UniProtKB/Swiss-Prot annotation:
Annotated GO MF terms: 1-deoxy-D-xylulose-5-phosphate synthase activity; magnesium ion binding; thiamine pyrophosphate binding
PANTHER family in UniProt: 1-D-DEOXYXYLULOSE 5-PHOSPHATE SYNTHASE-RELATED, 1-DEOXY-D-XYLULOSE-5-PHOSPHATE SYNTHASE, CHLOROPLASTIC
Functional pathway: Metabolic intermediate biosynthesis; 1-deoxy-D-xylulose 5-phosphate biosynthesis; 1-deoxy-D-xylulose 5-phosphate from D-glyceraldehyde 3-phosphate and pyruvate: step 1/1
Name listed for the protein in its UniProt record: 1-deoxy-D-xylulose-5-phosphate synthase
HAMAP family xref list: DXP_synth
EC number: 2.2.1.7
Catalytic class of the enzyme: transferase
Keywords, alphabetical: Isoprene biosynthesis, Magnesium, Metal-binding, Thiamine biosynthesis, Thiamine pyrophosphate, Transferase
InterPro entries associated with the record: Dxylulose-5-P_synthase (IPR005477), THDP-binding (IPR029061), Transketo_C/PFOR_II (IPR009014), Transketolase-like_Pyr-bd (IPR005475), Transketolase_BS (IPR020826), Transketolase_C (IPR033248), Transketolase_CS (IPR049557)
Gene: dxs
Species per Swiss-Prot/TrEMBL record: Listeria innocua serovar 6a (strain ATCC BAA-680 / CLIP 11262)
Cofactor(s) needed: Mg(2+); thiamine diphosphate
NCBIfam families: dxs (TIGR00204), PRK05444.2-2 (NF003933)
Quaternary state and interactors: Homodimer.
């Protein structure tokens, strides 16, 4: 470890770097790595991506002048070094905690965070907008999007590349190529980049030819200029064409992204170049920390706390399986008996626990990369051929495929089973990753069934019901983390479409809820019983369609009704119950909703966030007592 003279906690902005020589910059890099490893070992975070961009980030801030020059960090989880160099090292003990330092770029956090990210493949389009605004306003600054090879597989990135090349405006795109995104990359572009990584022969040959020609007296310069086409021919012979030059970029690289001097030199070349430039740098995810460097699965992409000395994770004893594992295990069981079942994931095989499925049924498993729109319509295509596709996708990423859900899946009433992972609050990743919008946007689509199980047994039953259903798409939501630990019975059963479960018969009032908030409702009902209130609890496992027969019986009791959901109130489950009440003219019933407000929910622990919005036994008890008092 280095002993750099500058205390990282005292950095206020990147201007100090301009006075450092290359050895001092390298010492700074070593200190930043040590700081990141120590800090994230306590808090957790995206350690792998950040260790890989230490030299790149230092070189960017050394070469350019932030915030006048604009850095846009695609996905944004690799912005920790940027945060350190822009004066936020002292806040790292609050990283991803409620009210603390955000794990992604945040405009309100620093003037150096010019664009907020969290989902992938957005940086290039944002950069196009900034470049156009700059030129219209006749301003002078550089726009530098930094995008990874994984994010570059997203369709939005290709759309932007096409536009950038066509515009021909000044822009410097940094391709941070570490041969991984969260999991190992897939797809044809990955193969193209692989060829470019090994094309040093071409780069050296091109440079040497140019130098030799320009040494020829008198005619040398002209000969070098007219030889460009010949050199392009050599390029095609050696690397079968460079994708980015065909799009209109000047391509620089590939270069070693951990060689500070080389990175700075190439950034200076890019600054002096007119038109769009793509600088292709090769980095090692997890650089400088052996457990992260050796990671081939994506385990060290983002972690909880860990022991620095051993690289072992500090986790509470795991006694039950995760929700993702429960769903994946049932998918495996079903697929073993039905060759029509196919699994699709957009770059999340590890998080969705589909690795075992991929090994067992390789011909029926498809990781399509960061391509949610393609994954969804691909599932629709499979369904037209009597296959049974299972689309495993995080709630926050399902947003990206809304049109495909509407136009390709639901409109055609195709039998696609959608496993909506990380549904509800996810905690530390904050605004960009909370899975709180899917109910609202799926509720508006005809032919869509939306469900959420209360425990592992019901998850299994809903999976079996979904694959037996043959009248359109069927979504199963499940949260991040572990289930409640319900043991599975020897055999499963199908649940009638739209049928809820009465767990406690309502007398004085009733709570309608589903998924993990059911446990909180039961605790609240127990507390209310101690107070002499007989409050029913209904497991509304079908969010759409509603159990209208049961709702009619409840409304006719004329007792207070409380809906509880870990999702947005606008367009949510409670809103659907209110619509039912209005449509059926139940005007003499008191009904209230507990859920998340019309705002983006920041990072922090899930229990703390839930408590702050009253989605807890305490909040439920208070609301029920308030409603009962009003109805007297």
């Amino acid at each position: 470890m280095s002993c750099f003279y500058l205390d990282l906690l005292k950095i206020k902005d990147p201007s100090f770097m301009k006075q450092l020589d290359i050895q001092e910059l390298e010492a700074l890099a070593a200190d930043i790595r040590a700081f990141l490893i120590t800090s994230t070992s306590k808090s957790g975070g995206h350690i792998g991506p950040n260790l890989g961009v230490v030299e790149l980030t230092i070189a960017l801030h050394y070469t350019f002048n932030s915030p006048n020059d604009k850095f846009i960090w695609d996905v944004g989880h690799q912005s920790y070094v940027h945060k350190i160099l822009t004066g936020r090292a002292s806040q790292f003990d609050t990283l991803r905690q409620h009210g603390g330092l955000d794990g992604f770029p945040k405009r309100k956090e620093s003037i150096h965070d010019v664009f907020e990210t969290g989902h992938s493949s957005t940086s290039l389009s944002a950069a196009v907008g900034m470049v156009i605004a700059r030129d219209i306003k006749k301003e002078d600054f550089y726009v530098i999007p930094i995008i990874g090879d994984g994010a570059l597989t997203g369709g939005m990135a290709f759309e932007a590349l096409n536009h950038i090349g066509d515009m021909g405006k000044d822009m410097i795109v940094i391709l941070n190529d570490n041969d991984m995104s969260i999991a190992p990359n897939v797809g044809a572009l990955h193969n193209v980049l692989g060829k470019l990584r090994t094309s040093n022969t071409f780069q050296q040959t091109k440079t040497n030819i140019d130098k030799l020609m320009r040494k020829i007296p008198t005619a040398g310069e002209k000969l070098a200029d007219t030889a460009e086409k010949a050199k392009d021919g050599i390029k095609h012979l050696l690397v079968e064409g460079t994708f980015f030059e065909e799009l209109g970029f000047m391509y620089l690289g590939p270069i070693d992204g951990h060689n500070l001097e080389d990175v700075i030199t190439n950034l200076e070349i890019a600054k002096r170049t007119k038109g769009p430039v793509l600088l292709h740098i090769i980095t090692k995810k997890g650089k400088g920390y052996q457990p992260a460097e050796l990671d081939s699965r994506g385990t060290w992409h983002g972690t909880g706390p860990y022991k620095v000395e051993t690289g072992s994770f500090i986790k509470p004893a795991k006694t039950v399986a995760s929700w993702s594992s429960v769903i994946s295990n049932e998918l495996m069981r079903l697929a073993a008996n039905d060759e029509r079942i196919v699994a699709i994931t957009p770059a999340m095989p590890v998080g969705s626990k589909l690795e075992k499925f991929a090994k067992t049924f390789p011909e029926r498993f498809f990781d399509v990369g960061i391509a949610e729109q393609h994954a969804t319509t691909m599932a629709a295509g499979l369904a037209t051929q009597a296959m049974k596709p299972f689309l495993a996708i995080y709630s926050t990423f399902l947003q990206r495929a809304y049109d495909q859900l509407v136009h390709d899946v639901c409109r055609q009433k195709l039998n696609v089973v959608i496993g909506i992972d990380r549904a509800g609050l996810v905690g530390a990743d904050g605004e960009t990753h909370q899975g709180i919008f899917d109910i609202s946007f799926l509720n508006s689509i005809p032919n869509m069934i939306i469900t959420m199980p209360k425990d592992e047994e019901e998850a299994r039953q809903l999976m079996d019901t979904a694959f037996a259903y043959d009248d359109g798409p069927f979504a199963i939501r499940y949260p991040r983390g572990n289930g409640p630990g319900k043991e599975l019975s020897e055999s499963s059963k199908l649940i009638p479409i739209g049928e809820w479960e009465t767990i406690i018969q309502p007398v004085d009032a009733v709570i309608l809820t589903f998924g993990p908030t059911l446990e909180q409702a039961l605790k609240a009902a127990e507390q209310l019983e101690d107070l002499g209130q007989r409050v029913g609890v209904i497991n509304a496992r079908f969010i759409k369609p509603l159990d209208e027969a049961l709702l009619h019986r409840i409304f006719k009791q004329k007792i207070p009704i409380l809906t509880v959901e870990e999702s947005l109130l606008k367009g949510g489950f409670g809103a659907s119950v209110l619509e039912f009440m209005e449509e059926n003219n139940y005007t003499d019933v008191t009904i209230h909703r507990i859920g998340l407000p019309d705002e983006f929910i920041g990072h922090g622990s899930v229990p703390l966030i839930l408590e702050s919005y009253g989605i807890s036994p305490t909040g439920i008890v208070l609301k029920i007592n308030e409603m009962l008092a009003q109805s007297e």
